[in-house]
From Swiss-Prot:
Keywords: Autophagy, Endosome, Lipid-binding, Membrane, Protein transport, Transport. The gene is SNX41. It comes from Cryptococcus neoformans var. neoformans serotype D (strain JEC21 / ATCC MYA-565). One of its GO terms (cellular component) is endosome membrane. It is found in: Endosome membrane; Endomembrane system. Residues 1-14, 225-239, 552-562 have a biased composition (Low complexity). This is Sorting nexin-41. Residues 15-30 have a biased composition (Pro residues). Residues 1-69, 215-239, 408-432, 545-638 are annotated as: Disordered.
Amino acid sequence: MDSDTSPNPFASSPPSSPSPRPSLPPPVPRKPSSLVSAASGSPPPTHRASFPDPARHPKMGATVPGPKPKTGYCCSIDKDISAGEQVHIVDALKTTEGGTASYITYVIRLGTHTVRRRYSAFLSLHQSLTGLYPVLIIPPIPSKQSLTDYAVKGQSKAREDATIIARRKRLLEDFLQRLIRHPILGGEHVLHRFLEEDVSWSEVLHSPPISLLSKNPLHAPSHNPTFQPTTPTSPSEAPATTSYIAHHLLPTPSPSHPLRQPDQRFMDSEAFTEKFQSHFSGTMEKVNRRVTKRWGERAHDMSELGGIWNGFSLVEQGKLGDAIEKVGRAVDAEYLATAALLQSWEKTTTEPLHIYSQFATLIRARLSFRHQKHVQYELVQEALETQRDKLEILENAEREARRLEEALERGGSVLASPQLEPEAARDERERAQRRARASQGFGLLSAVKHSLSGMIDMDPEATRRANIAKTRDNISQLEDSYQAAAQDLKYASMTLQADLDRFQRQKVADLREMAINLSQVHRDWCKQNLEAWKAAQAAVREIDPHPNRPAQTQTQVQSQQSHAGPSTLHAQTEDDVSKLGVDAMKNEIERVEIEIADKPLPKPSLAETGGDGVVPSPQPRQENDTEEQEGHGPLGPL
């Protein structure tokens, strides 16, 4: 890995999060927790220590209380989940219950419980959990059908496509499995009711706690979004009502609003999530689609090639025809193995990559929500400082007016006001600068308003006192909102960081499993092809050898096979064929040389002997040869 790679901010846990634990043995039944979930009052699993406890009151001020503790399991579904039961979607059925149009329902099984839910119920469950837990990472669900599918296939065929239904079954099952394994979401009673048979999901959606959710999650407590005020019957219940009002008075900032003092830890998390999303969505998914497309094209070509070989086998007879048929079968087997590889590839690689691309989008939404909570805190803090400065100015003016009034009553002597001390003057300048920043863009309007109010006001003293009272009321409300925003920001930061730590450990385990599954898919593909081509090789060896090449003995073939390993068998076979051709050529040359050596040399003719039967000896070359003296060689002039 490159040295300039930024560190992973998800790996740094806050003090409330424990260090990653080693792999645990199979789940064992757990005892019910005395804590309850923040939304519906159902007990979460016991291993939720890394998350802040919403049942505890925060240290600063009296705010919205958390859920009340309870004992025991809330239902049989909760007990089965605690015992380690797994959830599965075992079937998808076409039905017309409750209407005239047909739709697909998915059969969910958890232990002995079986229930049928349609896709819209899964979608509403995801939306409900997102509202109940605005700072937790809710697992994604498969997206709806695209408009292109409806346009090409039609509405009914797109819904009933077997490939789409099978993919949805796997992705929806993954969604439910991630929910029940979550340390907080697994104890949510809304999820239990979704998995419980004979429960109308429509009634669940229109009953508490889902019906108590606020339309704007920024105006609700992060740790208890379903909190509703009641008429206080005792002084201890009054702060809860006050905090409820304070939450609804909080501003609604934009997600792009800048922060004056951002948290560096979450800035790193946002940058890491953006790179994580870009890497999965823009790089890995794109390359994965290209690779699977090429594998699919190769499978199509192998299908055509297998048909050609099988057709050719009908033309030939005997051992050659059998060998050609076996080669065609091997090609067909490779086509089938590639098709199986693509199916397994989609389950083990394509779908997990898409799930984590969706996870990146969901994490960015949770980080954006926490960012808005931080902006709320800073805006309320700034407004509170402005109102306090305004109150101080009004109170100073009131004291100055009273001092002048008392001086006039004592004798009309007007005392000069003492000069401000250097520190007081500096504080006054800072307050003036803050007021200028707060009223930036409204300077002319404020001046005109102040002038008009001065001309119209008939009793400035009463107006000033009314402004003081109104400012004090505003400060009181802002202090309540400031406490509520501070509590929300603290809980959102701690909970989101703890869930990011949990997600990081889960991501590492999932990517490891994905890599192992991908290697196993390729291994199985290679095994199937090897078996098919071994059968074809055995059939090819039964064909008679080439007439121009010496045939190998059975002993030579067996010795070569025994010394050759599986990985080098194919390469050695090609080398043997080439060596056989060279050896045959050498043998032919040696045979011709032997025949020539055994034949007697022919006798010289009369022309060569000069008529006397004696072959003349060659004349030696003269050193002073005329041609050489003239500069001529045997090939011409030099």
